[in-house]
Amino acid sequence: MDDSPWPQCDIRVQDTFGPQVSGCYEDFDFTLLFEESILYLPPLLIAASVALLRIWQLRSTENLLKRSGLLSILKPTSTTRLSNAAIAIGFVASPIFAWLSFWEHARSLRPSTILNVYLLGTIPMDAARARTLFRMPGNSAIASIFATIVVCKVVLLVVEAMEKQRLLLDRGWAPEETAGILNRSFLWWFNPLLLSGYKQALTVDKLLAVDEDIGVEKSKDEIRRRWAQAVKQNASSLQDVLLAVYRTELWGGFLPRLCLIGVNYAQPFLVNRVVTFLGQPDTSTSRGVASGLIAAYAIVYMGIAVATAAFHHRSYRMVMMVRGGLILLIYDHTLTLNALSPSKNDSYTLITADIERIVSGLRSLHETWASLIEIALSLWLLETKIRVSAVAAAMVVLVCLLVSGALSGLLGVHQNLWLEAMQKRLNATLATIGSIKGIKATGRTNTLYETILQLRRTEIQKSLKFRELLVALVTLSYLSTTMAPTFAFGTYSILAKIRNMTPLLAAPAFSSLTIMTLLGQAVSGFVESLMGLRQAMASLERIRQYLVGKEAPEPSPNKPGVASTEGLVAWSASLDEPGLDPRVEMRRMSSLQHRFYNLGELQDGLIVLQNHTASWEKASKPVLTDINVTITRGSFVIVIGPIGSGKSTLLHSILGEVPHTTGIRTIQEVDTAFCAQTPWLTNTNVRDNILGASHFDPAWYNAVVKACALHRDFAQLPHGDRSMIGSKGILLSGGQKGRLALARALYARKALLVLDDVFAGLDPKTGQEVFTSLFGARGLLRQGKTTTVLATNSTQNLSMADYIMVLGSEGRLIEQGTPTELLNSGSSLRLEELVKTREGKSKAEPERERPEYARALRNSVLGATPVAARRRFSDMAIYKLYIRTIGWGSWWIFIVLCSGFVVALTLSRENTLALPSACAGVDLLTACLEEIWLKFWTEANARNPHDRLGYYLSLFAVWSALAITFFLGACLHLMLRMVPKAAKIFHGSLLQTVMRAPLVFFSKTDSGEISNHFSQDLELIDMELPRALIGAVIALILCISAMAVIVYSSNYLAATIPGLLGLLYLVQMFYLRTSQQLRVLELETRAPLLSHYMETIQGLVSLRAFGWSKHFKDRHHGHLKVAQQSAYLLFCAQIWLTLTLDIIVAFLAIILVSIAVTVKNSSAASIGLALVNLIAFGANMKGLVYNWTALENAMGAIARVRDFTTETPCEIQVGESHSPSPGWPQRGLIKFKSVTASYDFTSHPVLNDVTFTVQPGEKLAICGRTGCGKSSLVSSLLRLLEVRNGAIEVDGIDISTLSREDVRMSLNVLPQEPFFYHGTIRQNLDPNCLSSDEEILETLALLGLREVISKKGGLDVAMDDGFLSHGQQQLLCLARAILKKSRILILDEVTSSVDQETETLITRVLRDRLQDQTVISIAHRLNTIMDYDKVIILDKGCIVEQGNPQVLALQRSIFASLLRSGDEEPGNGHKHESEGEEE
């Protein structure tokens, strides 16, 4: 006899498909046949099939675990009386699962996903079967077996879910990689980071490791290969490449999104079932139905939580991979760009603004197709509830979708216009930061400030049309939410009254309202995802156009990789040879197998040019014409010629960098090193700059350091050669930067060395020492038999060359040969330069002064130890700062409009209560809202069908119209008034801070960090903040109102509110401490990536010449991995918060339904209202989290801007705001009175007790060895240094009392490094528009530039990189100085980069046109200052000698010694020509 406590059910009932049993168990159970055929067999068959495939896959992988005993537990089989097939299949599947468990354990990092999903899914099904069997007569034994099976499965699930980090052979795996399906579903692996961030400050080292997919380690080769194939096949669709590479991650989001659709659309059925249940009287089945409804709500809402988290997780992973892949492609292509390519600077916008738009757009990629499915489902479900009336809602949706589709097409167009304007502003800003020293020196900060502000205003103006379209699209998305219920319910009610049908009652009304809530979410999701996708596609197209740009140069002769170390050639050096160590071995490049880039025979020539013509632009006049030359191995070749003759272009031609050439260029494949005119340095320490991509060899390193005369500089550095040099080595002297770049080229030990005017900026003695150490008979390069090509403007030391090439002004080779051949042929070169012996200059006196920058920055960034940056968390102060920026009045208008929208939406959709604080007139409004409109309407219909239909319907429509009006007003006010105002103010504050920062600040702060403020931070403030702000504000108000309605509709639920608020407070406190730090880290880790990118752009030619492209790719990838890591973990933090809040909503749903179905003391309409609001609450909570996290991110950018503007020092001090009288200085009298100066008040002085006087009209020369303080003296006069003691007077006025900008604008300065604005020739020559065109053209003609400028387009042509050679740029600066009227002229080595003819021209112009001005000139070429009135000799920041140069030259003076060494001056040209400019 059966002992079952439940009523018996006949087997004939259980043998039907059902699925619901009938006639027993209170009709609340499945039939046994349904359970076996649906709940048991399909999951078993699917799991077994997938298990076999997985076993086959795992067999080909390697073992990942340590050897250990493996306990395999076979799944117990079960039998039933109804299905032998179930027994057989279960029996067969059991060993398959055991086999799979073994292979998964040994060959997989994670616990078996298949087994975990199967066990987790079938345990509830088996429990249901066990319950059914227990209720069957005479089946207690089988039921007990099934109950045992359920227990065993639970045990197996626990065992299979156990992770195996401790058993792995390699412990370096990321936590996510080893996490099981349950761990990943609930993000348990992320909890340690949250705990760590809660307890302590996070740094990059403390972040969780992420897998190689996120770091783009796995996909980098594939995406490069596929893109190369696409370009080669002229099928360069970037979208297709991304789909092919990341298809797995893309498809990975489909399943969880489909599951999310399923559980979301179970909600209307549940609402309808609960409302119907509450409207029915209690029966014998009520208890079972109530329990089933509670369980169903638990399953659905927990399913929503897990599916949402899984979907977002997969989406974010895909987005991060795409982000990393695109940045890699952009960087790779940048490495191939021509040095003068204008797009290389534009690419900065691509990796900042465009990438962010792509990330933002692709995050909602799956919403596009999912929303369409949800819209279709919603309309179908709505049709089942309100029949033909659903057509009205469908028409509203259709109109919104069609208009949205049409408008979204314009979105990409106007976004590109905005981005182009942003690109111009960023390029000008980056150029300004890069030339800040020259800009400050010339007093052009105000001019540049206004110029960039105007570019910002133009950018904001360009963005307005885009913002208007954005507002229109967002409004359309809300239009369907507000108007669809009005049209649907209105149509239903009218038709019901006309046809005398059942009126609108609670069950269909609230289930329909639930469906329309989901419909509104779907339409909003589609429109927003469409907007994001359009923006992403527009940015992808911009990136694609950049990647397919035909701007790559010809292949360089250099072989990629580091220098070969084969073929060691021993050499020795005598101790009297400067800079050489006799213990060092010189490694010469092995003779590589010959490969030719062009046809022709090399014979003995390493480089052969035949009829070679070269130009930088295809349609322009050739820079080089008909060049024929052969350069043999091991030779030292000097290339000379006047400025603009094409010397730099010839060197670039040898390197394969000139894009347009004709003739034959034959170069043997050799490893090459290159030194550009502008020394290219990276923001690392001194040693790393010298090593580059080479390995450290102490002996060779020391030999190179001595040869470049750097060892004495190292001795004065706070940390020796481990001292940081700052961005571009900003406070290094020109000579020090040049020698550092030269040392890098020497250390690389390349077979071919190409030098472009590298001795410029060196004082005669230091220059001669380095020159002899390299090219003397026992010089470093001579001993190594290195082929060297040196371009210079100087004719000094020509006798030491093996071969000389003389270029004419038209770019033709007018003379060439050995010094002897040129001497015998009657060369135009000076005779004495051709007959000097090569050994006569080996006794150069070493320079012994302490470098001025070492003294100045002993305690600065050069010696700083990197520390973790402070974390500034966004707080209420940041929000208040933003509100103050836009204005409190504007803010309250925005809040009132948002509140009006929510109140109107409340009454139109009838799903919330307005809070008294929402607006004024509280009493009246509260009285009107005491009963909710739809609840009131449906209850009235239940009492009196169709009564006062017009009243209810008209107010319904009014509230809908008001809602959309308020929303449109809020959006327009935000986007067109608040955002532009904030954009202008924050940018202006940043720019003003940079312009007012002291010069030393730029040596302590990485340029990438500064640039990050102007790109990423402003991008967040401009774009992310407004979208997040309006979304967060509205979602917050809706959440509060929805919660109020839920409590109002279910009194018992009010008891949970204190606990809910406490829980939310704990969650946000726990979450915020970590997420805020992650947000700051995410922004901070971008700075090294951007800095590295900018350094790469600046050194493109050098990178390719050295063959270091791969090394820099690897370094870039390292920075990218760190940036990806922090960004991905920030996304994971947001997913964790969404999951947590969804689980809280699930518990609320369970509590609400449990109270409703068990107590049943509320009306069906009230509970329906509460359930609809619960759905809205969940959706709005997600919207709040999504927008709030984005808002916090943007507020983090504002916090960074605030910190930057408040913590950056300002060079303007108290008491120096006075302005000089107009026309000051009128005389030009300069007095230094015991001046001691330093870069700031905390660093070591660079000038000590300097006293001298320059009378009006006198010409003063400042001389001395490199680093002696010459530039510091001039900088102190220009107020770039801080005068700690003494005073500097100009025309009797202490300049420390005057505005720094006024002082600089009143003086006339020709800086060592020419700089130009991003504007026309006219704007650069006459920025204040004080000269006529005739005066400008006359000045240009005086300097021989009028014809050059005319050929390039005249005064109104825009200047860009490579517009003029460096020497021509220096002449253009001189023209600017002539046009500027000032009594004092400051010259900083203005003749160092020009040939003798141009030097004579400059000297004559200075004498004839500026004879009445007081002149202070820094000079290395002492022959140019012999007619000066006075000369000052500096050493270690002190005046060691002063007097008339002609008098001192005849005495046994320091000046006479320098003058004699000046006759031995090496090739002195200027060092600051950009790599792509031709000389």
Curated annotation (Swiss-Prot):
The record's GO CC annotations read:
plasma membrane
The record's annotation in Pfam families points to: ABC_membrane, ABC_tran
Keyword Nucleotide-binding assigned: yes
Domain ABC transporter: residue ranges: 607-835, 1230-1461
Q: How does it sit in the membrane?
A: Multi-pass membrane protein
Basic and acidic residues bias spans: 1461-1479
Q: Which residues are glycosylated?
A: N183, N234, N345, N427, N611, N628, N793, N797, N1161, N1187
Which GO molecular function annotation, any one, does this entry have? ABC-type transporter activity
- Region annotation (Disordered) ranges: 1460-1479
Q: Which residues cross the membrane?
A: 32-52, 82-102, 142-162, 251-271, 291-311, 365-382, 391-411, 469-489, 503-523, 885-905, 955-975, 1028-1048, 1052-1072, 1135-1155, 1165-1185
- Coiled-coil boundaries: none
Q: Where is the ABC transmembrane type-1 domain?
A: 258-535, 932-1193
Q: Which UniProt keywords apply?
A: ATP-binding, Cell membrane, Glycoprotein, Membrane, Nucleotide-binding, Repeat, Transmembrane, Transmembrane helix, Transport
Compartments it resides in: Cell membrane
- Superkingdom to which the source organism belongs: Eukaryota
Q: Which InterPro entries match?
A: AAA+_ATPase (IPR003593), ABC1_TM_dom (IPR011527), ABC1_TM_sf (IPR036640), ABC_transporter-like_ATP-bd (IPR003439), ABC_transporter-like_CS (IPR017871), ABC_transporter_C-like (IPR050173), ABCC_6TM_D2 (IPR044726), P-loop_NTPase (IPR027417)
Q: Which SMART domains does this entry report, sorted A to Z?
A: AAA (SM00382)
Practical use, per the record, is:
Due to their effectiveness as antifungal agents, echinocandin derivatives can be used for the treatment of human invasive candidiasis.
Provide the binding site for ATP.
641-648, 1264-1271
This chain's function reads:
ABC transporter; part of the gene cluster that mediates the biosynthesis of echinocandin B, a fungal lipidated cyclic hexapeptide that acts as an antifungal agent.
- The identity of this protein, by name, is ABC transporter ecdL
